[in-house]
Amino acid sequence: MEITDVRLRRVETDGRMKAISSITIDGEFVIHDIRVIDGNEGLFVAMPSKRTPDGEFRDIAHPINSGTRAKIQEAVLAAYEVADEPAVNEESSADESVVEEN
């Protein structure tokens, strides 16, 4: 599995979310709404999730092994570090910056 494209949009919120990302896997499959979160021990990647009726959050898509999770996190955080556009307000419709990985 190779991450062939990362699109990232920085957001400015009062919370800990710093960016929203989409990744393309092998040029054939896209996962949207991957979030970059500023956690207690630094930045980390949160997979897309949905709130259940009982208030619990469940991942919609997620890697099933630690190696794949590491690949996704490394690719998204690398795109976050090189994104040179300024943060935008979450409500605005800014274009996404694109970082391609091969």
From Swiss-Prot:
Q: Report the SUPFAM superfamilies cross-referenced here.
A: SpoVG-like
**Sorted alphabetically, which keywords does the UniProt record give?**
Cell cycle, Cell division, Septation
The record's Gene3D superfamilies line, in alphabetical order, gives: Stage V sporulation protein G (3.30.1120.40)
Q: Which InterPro entries match?
A: SpoVG, SpoVG_sf
Q: Which domain of life is it from?
A: Bacteria
Biological processes per GO annotation: division septum assembly; sporulation resulting in formation of a cellular spore
Q: What does this protein do?
A: Could be involved in septation.
Q: What is this protein called?
A: Putative septation protein SpoVG 1
What's the source species for this entry? Listeria innocua serovar 6a (strain ATCC BAA-680 / CLIP 11262)
